[in-house]
């Protein structure tokens, strides 16, 4: 049995292309603040700041590639940081997808743009971070510090062929990954165990 923890935390920073185009200085500052300390899994926001936004509306293949690349970035990242001040279905989908696979999400928004719907979500992996032009860097650092404590740790162990067969069967029957089944099983036991103080 061993536990592996990545030494280089990877961050996926994403925002609405429409908003990046309206305030390149802000998004440049956000990208630079994050990338000085952490490995970025995508430089898309940085490319938008430097070269402008690509219009994908007329290109079905480019849309598909953009979608697949976004999912890869979510999966690869340890933490997802989003700027959600504007109304965007894409940002809502990305946020939902990241939380679905248990990634900590920092959802940043300008002080005057509180996201009413997302603010109603009750997910321990979601960090809502209100910021101003003055405190954006500090808000990023404080939010990342919180998010680091929410990152799942990879835990590997050996099982018998019989247990593996059962896990495969459960996965197919219930349509859930083996790791999710095991996590849920352990969490149920934790709730039952009155001596556990974690």
Please report, for each region that a protein language model flagged, where it lies by residue.
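A short, flexible N-terminal coil/short beta segment enriched in small residues
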Residues: 5-36
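Amphipathic helical hotspot of TIR/SEFIR-family domains
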Residues: 86-107
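Short, basic amphipathic alpha-helical segments that act as recognition/interaction helices
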Residues: 174-198
């Amino acid at each position: 049995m061993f536990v592996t923890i990545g030494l280089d935390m990877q961050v996926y920073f994403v925002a609405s292309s429409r908003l990046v185009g309206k305030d390149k200085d802000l998004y440049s500052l956000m990208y630079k603040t994050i990338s000085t300390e952490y490995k970025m899994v995508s430089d898309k926001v940085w490319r938008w700041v430097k070269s402008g936004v690509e219009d994908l509306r007329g290109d079905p293949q480019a849309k598909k590639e953009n979608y697949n690349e976004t999912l890869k970035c979510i999966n690869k990242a340890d933490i997802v940081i989003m700027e959600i001040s504007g109304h965007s279905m894409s940002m809502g989908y990305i946020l939902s997808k990241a939380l679905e696979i248990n990634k900590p999400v920092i959802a940043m928004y300008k002080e005057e743009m509180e996201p009413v719907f997302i603010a109603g979500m009750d997910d321990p992996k979601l960090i809502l971070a209100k910021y101003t032009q003055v405190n954006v860097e500090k808000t990023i650092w404080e939010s990342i510090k919180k998010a680091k404590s929410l990152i799942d740790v990879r835990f590997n162990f050996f099982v018998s062929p019989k247990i593996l067969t059962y896990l495969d069967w459960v996965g197919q029957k219930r349509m859930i990954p083996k790791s999710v089944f095991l996590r849920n099983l352990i969490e149920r036991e934790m709730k039952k165990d009155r001596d556990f103080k974690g």
